[in-house]
UniProtKB/Swiss-Prot annotation, chain A:
Name of protein: Dynein light chain roadblock-type 2
Protein localization: Cytoplasm, Cytoskeleton
Listed GO biological process terms: microtubule-based movement
Species of origin: Bos taurus
Molecular function via GO: dynein intermediate chain binding
Gene3D superfamilies (alphabetical): Dynein light chain 2a, cytoplasmic (3.30.450.30)
SUPFAM superfamilies: Roadblock/LC7 domain (SSF103196)
Length: 96, 785
């Protein structure tokens, strides 16, 4: 358990990372480093998007599965790593 | 029915019909019922006229029919007065009726056909007689026909049919139909209802995608397998345990924090974040191929990629490096200390190239790690050898340290799991070679050629051996203690050697037997000594560990990974080996020489090419100048004098330089001739100001480079300072000597010369400090140089 905590801390303190959050299977955020309203917004929207992406990948080949999702925008990059029950979202500003 | 109905009506008319009651009451006047009308005699004698009509008293008098024509109900005037009192259906029909006639006709036909049949079957004599009475009455015919009919019954039946058919077409109903209908008793209907409480409801919605179906099937399969397993291991104890375990697991699940399940995702995210941060390095790793290698004449470079370091291992030197045989991006770093006086703890870190900021696995131990290796078949097993002589095995699958301690007799040196090395001699299990003068640091077999191996030692040399021959085939002197050597996995002629001065040398015997095709400092500070080097099995990268605990990953440029050209019919792998054998044989003819070539060989190209200089480099050269001055020196070197000086400078990086310079009084021209080995021919042209002189040097390649020599003199006579800065027409600075004009670099030279003057002879001994500054980005050679 401490390992995961450490990993999350490392991620949060990594260069360029704006925020991290852990969202459960229903789209409810469990842990976050951002403020409430932003978190809720991100959680809701990204949860849906991840489900859609996962459904797409698996529809094409049911033995395949989504590993991660990256959305690169002008301002920053949103990275989503889905798990069986949880969703880990990290927003980073790639240093460029 | 109708008769019965009529009868009933007559009987009932007593009470029903209004007129009837009155008549009956009056005819029975003698008997006085109690409700009889009390009438006077006059009224009694009144005569009432009654008329008998043939009307049916029971017939309705006011039948109303709906007239569709007029659209109203209309009274019908004419009413049927017929009253049927009795009727019965009989079975006699009148002769003249249709039915009677038909029957009669039919009977006649029957008789006639019988006769004709008789004619056919019996003797033809009777034909005329039979035909005669045929037309007679049916009765007479029938009588005579009877015996005939009986005789020829069967035939007549057939005959009967055929004459009947054309005459009689209409078949009437022979049966007496009567329609009967009856209505069953209709049971009264009853509605019975019952209402219960509605069952609890929930809304359920789902999608049926391809993958949902697949998942359902997979679940089913798993369930089946589980049940199979349960059946196999069925004991009451096991059941109990199972239940307990189940309970425990459920308990734990509800208790444990949700965070532990995010482990996998967190790992992935960490790698992604690192990928973003080190994006350019990752891209370089994958795609960058140094294009300048084409111009570099077979030499290559090492491109620094990631740097791996961990705070916990900061003080510890890297003592071992090993790539994982299965996962080509995972490597193990063993930390310990080479200082035999100071021994502290050790660490084993496993890094993945996908995450350069934090190791994947960390293990710490009490004693320093000296060597490590990974199991080929079970890539999760790592064996390490400690300084205190213990050997431990770590299982990466389990999170805890699992040692299998075995103390060994050797008290920790570089214990390669295969080889044992001793201090003074390199010894095989079969043989002993007199190899090195000092400690042998590493020995390694060639991965392709089974006879060849090499060894490196702190005596600055790397030697390549053929194990059947006692003397080494090749010896390389690297000017510094060699920490480690490694063969490249992709070619049998390429190997790398790392030295304690922070340089990595890469040799390719098929390209250049005597020299490195790349030597490059790879660690930032000169204090860092590189301790180990390893090639990655598939990627063109090497990892280099130093004594500060840092591991640097470098990419080999294309020139360093040249594959030998495939010859027809020969496998590529064996090719280089064959080549080596050839070289071997060649050298054996000349085996007395140790084949160590000085780096300053005339044919060799300039060594400074192909090396990435550190941002600055200094060299000190000793310069002895003898000057003959026409006028004894009073103020340094005056341009108005004729002076002849010969200088010889020696420096570790420079060629011996002999320079002859003559200054002629007009001070416009000075000629200096340098001996060819310095590759430089300088022509001095002394200029106006007394302490400034301009010199033009002519390089061997016939390019003119002006360089500015600034002379200054200090108060102390015997000492004069001269500095030189040269300017290259390409805009960058270069120095004519001692490096030659091969590189345009910023060079500053400060030299301190002590002059001993005796009359007109002046002897100067000077130390020059040449400072060479690397201008980053200016790797391409100067057009003038």
């Amino acid at each position: 358990m401490a390992e995961v905590e450490e990993t999350l801390k490392r991620i949060q303190s990594h260069k360029g990372v704006i925020g991290t959050m852990v969202v459960n299977a229903e789209g409810i955020p469990i842990r976050t480093t951002l403020d409430n309203s932003t978190t809720v917004q991100y959680a809701g929207l990204l949860h849906q998007l991840t489900m859609k992406a996962k459904s797409t990948v698996r529809d094409i080949d049911p033995q395949n599965d989504l590993t991660f999702l990256r959305i690169r925008s002008k301002k920053h990059e949103i990275m989503v790593a889905p798990d069986k029950e949880y969703l880990l979202i990290v927003i980073q500003n790639p240093c460029e | 029915m109708a008769s019965r109905a009529a009868r009933k009506r007559d009987e009932d008319s007593v009470t029903e019909v209004g007129e009837g009651t009155d008549e009956w009451a009056q005819s029975k006047a003698t008997v006085r019922p109690p409700d009889q009308l009390e009438l006077t005699d006059a009224e009694l004698k009144e005569e009432f006229t009654r008329i008998l009509t043939a009307n049916n008293p029971h017939a309705p008098q006011n039948i109303v029919r709906y007239s569709f024509k007029e659209g109203t109900y209309k009274l019908i005037g004419f009413v049927n007065q017929l009253a049927v009192h009795y009727s019965q259906v009989g079975n006699l029909i009148p002769k003249d009726s249709d039915e009677g006639r038909r029957q009669h006709y039919r009977n006649e036909l029957v008789a006639g056909s019988q006769e004709s049949a008789k004619v056919v079957v019996s003797e033809p004599d009777l034909l005329e007689e039979e035909e005669g009475p045929k037309e007679a009455e049916a009765e007479t015919g029938s009588q005579t026909d009877v015996p005939a009919a009986e005789a020829a019954e069967k035939v007549t039946e057939e005959e009967l049919i055929t004459p009947k058919q054309p005459k009689e077409q209409k078949l009437t109903n022979q049966f007496n139909f009567s329609e009967r209908a009856s209505q069953t008793f209709n049971n009264p209907l009853r509605d019975r209802e019952c209402q219960m409480e509605p069952p609890p409801r929930t809304n359920f919605s789902a999608t049926a995608n391809q993958w949902e179906i697949y998942d359902a099937y997979v679940e089913e399969l798993e369930k089946q397998e589980k049940t199979k397993e349960k059946e196999k291991t069925k004991t009451p104890v096991a059941k109990k345990m199972g239940k307990m375990a189940m309970r425990k697991t459920t308990f734990l699940e509800s208790q444990s924090d949700d965070i532990t399940k995010v482990t996998q995702a967190a790992k992935i995210i960490e790698r992604m974040v690192n990928q973003n941060t080190y994006d350019d390095i990752a891209q370089d790793f994958k795609y960058y191929e140094d294009a300048a290698d084409e111009y570099r004449d077979q030499e290559g470079t090492l491109l620094p990629l990631w740097k791996f370091q961990n705070d916990k291992a900061k003080r510890l030197a890297v003592t071992a490096l090993c790539w994982n045989p299965k996962y080509k991006d995972l490597f193990a770093v063993g930390h310990g200390s080479y200082d035999f006086m100071k021994q502290s703890r050790g660490m084993l870190l496993l890094y993945s190239m996908k995450n350069p900021s934090f190791p994947e696995y960390i293990f710490s131990s009490d004693s320093g790690i000296m060597c490590l290796d990974m199991h080929v078949d079970h890539p999760y097993l790592v064996v390490v050898g400690h300084y205190d002589g213990n050997v431990a095995i770590y299982n990466l699958k389990k999170p805890h340290f699992q040692p299998a301690f075995r103390s060994s007799a050797k008290s920790g040196k570089h214990t390669d799991p295969v080889w044992q090395c001793s201090k003074s001699y390199s010894s095989q299990f079969l043989d002993t070679y007199d190899a090195h003068n000092m400690a042998v640091d590493a020995v390694s077999w060639n991965p392709y050629h089974t006879k060849v191996f090499m060894s490196c030692s702190s005596d600055w040399t790397v030697k390549i051996w053929d194990h059947t021959i006692k003397t080494p085939m090749f010896i390389y002197d690297l000017n510094s203690a060699v920490g480690d050597v490694a063969w490249a996995p992709y070619s049998s002629t390429v190997f790398a050697a790392v030295t304690t001065d922070g340089k990595t040398h890469i040799f390719d015997l098929s390209i250049n037997k005597y020299e490195a095709i790349c030597n490059q400092p790879v660690v930032a500070k000169k204090k860092n000594k590189i301790t180990h080097v390893q090639f990655n099995p598939i990627h063109p990268i090497i990892i280099v560990g130093d004594d500060r605990g840092h591991v640097t990953c470098l990419k080999l440029s294309p020139n360093l990974r040249k594959m030998p050209k495939e010859k027809k019919g020969q496998e590529v792998q064996k090719g280089p080996a064959v080549e080596i054998a050839k070289l071997d044989k060649l050298l054996n003819l000349d085996s007395s020489q140790p084949a160590s070539q000085p780096r300053r060989s005339p044919e060799a190209p300039a060594h400074t090419e192909g090396t990435l200089w550190k941002p600055w480099q200094a060299c000190v050269s000793l310069c002895i100048q003898a000057m003959y001055l026409r006028v004894p020196p009073s103020v340094g070197l005056s341009p108005a004098q004729v002076c002849l000086f010969v200088s010889y400078s020696v420096s570790p990086f420079a060629f011996p330089d002999v320079c002859l310079c003559l200054c002629i009084p007009p001070c416009l021209l000075a000629v200096s001739v340098c001996v060819p080995i310095s590759e430089c021919l300088s022509i001095f042209c002394v200029s106006l100001s007394p302490s400034l002189s301009l010199c033009i040097s002519l390089h061997q390649s016939l390019c003119l480079t002006p360089c500015l020599w600034v002379y200054g003199s200090l108060l102390f006579l015997p000492v004069f300072l001269h500095g030189c800065v040269s300017l290259c027409p390409c805009g960058r600075l270069s120095l004519p000597s001692p490096w030659g004009l091969c590189r345009c670099l910023r060079l500053f030279c400060v030299s301190l010369c002590v002059c001993l003057a005796a009359r007109r002879l002046c002897l100067c001994v000077g130390l020059s400090l040449y400072l060479r500054l690397w201008v980053s980005g200016s790797q391409s050679p100067c057009l003038w140089g």
